[in-house]
Amino acid sequence: MTRPGVGVAITGSGSAVPSTTLSNDQLSQLVETSDEWIRSRTGIGQRRVAQPQIESLSSLAAAAGQSALEAAGLEATSVDLILLATSTPDDLFGSACQVQAALGATQAVAFDLTAACSGFLFALVTGAQFIRSGAYRTVLVIGADVLSRWTDWSDRRTCVLFGDGAGAVVLQASEIDQLLGFEMRSDGSLNGCLTLAYQADNQSLLSDIEIAQGTYQPVAMNGQEVYRFAVKRVPEILEKTLFHAGIDRQEVDWLLLHQANQRILDAVADRLDISRDRVLSNLVNYGNTSSATIPLVLDEAVKAGKIQSGDLIAASGFGAGLSWGAALFRWGTVV
């Protein structure tokens, strides 16, 4: 429920990617694959990978956040809340506070939100609700992941998919509410389809006390199940969001989907009867950057002049959990 006179507007976007590119041809030196095989099945041509001692999750997130603040014409000290959507923090206790310090956002509360590839969309909705409640007026929402840390580079089923990056948007209180609707869902019964699971070794602490210590396994995925899930659930939730907002799908200017696989993007557009040329995609350059995909492709489209003030955008994130969601918003603001 929106309080009278307190709506939400997206006033700026930003992004950051590592400087190092890993091409499909380079991947063919690691696993049995080829540029043609990867492109034809995923739409991916290359991806970025963070280099140790040069880039970190926190540094990429902070750079994207700073870019978004500059686009919104704001100083970091004006931010009330920082939400960092990530599954690959530099510190398991969370990296949002590191980002807060790097930005100099001394007045902001900061915390991580973990929902894998749905994370940015879930964080966007969470930030909007803080504004609508009247608790905060300016929220910085960042989606960032460094999945190269948790990729099995000997598994061609997964290593061809993932890349590193960060994207961000600024949410501000607005008399005109630009977030027109949202829906979020989770189905834990499908959790095993996409995991980055903790693997423990049992150790005896005392004669009658045993503990488990270990680390995380690389990303594991049942690609066929995830594809079937995405092409069914994503169109459904987008249609529900549009219906509740009273908006026809043909009024949508841009379809902004989690960049998982070009086949999924095309299938969702076809099922919604939305022209593929209205689907934003940068998979060819970055691959699947998890929680960063939506804000990264959004920011590139804004900077390229594709997205104009007043454009209606239907967004959907989906992934591990399994979780999925949709949000409908207009770009450009009156604050």
From Swiss-Prot:
Subcellular location: Cytoplasm
Catalytic residues, chain numbering: 117, 258, 288
Alphabetized Gene3D superfamilies for the sequence: 3.40.47.10
Reaction equation(s) it catalyzes: malonyl-[ACP] + acetyl-CoA + H(+) = 3-oxobutanoyl-[ACP] + CO2 + CoA
Enzyme class: transferase
Any one GO cellular component localisation term in the record: cytoplasm
EC number: 2.3.1.180
Pathway this chain belongs to: Lipid metabolism; fatty acid biosynthesis
GO molecular function: 3-oxoacyl-[acyl-carrier-protein] synthase activity; beta-ketoacyl-acyl-carrier-protein synthase III activity
Gene Ontology BP, a term: fatty acid biosynthetic process
Record-linked NCBIfam families: fabH, PRK09352.1
Protein name: Beta-ketoacyl-[acyl-carrier-protein] synthase III
Taxonomic lineage of the native organism: Bacteria, Bacillati, Cyanobacteriota, Cyanophyceae, Synechococcales
Protein's gene: fabH
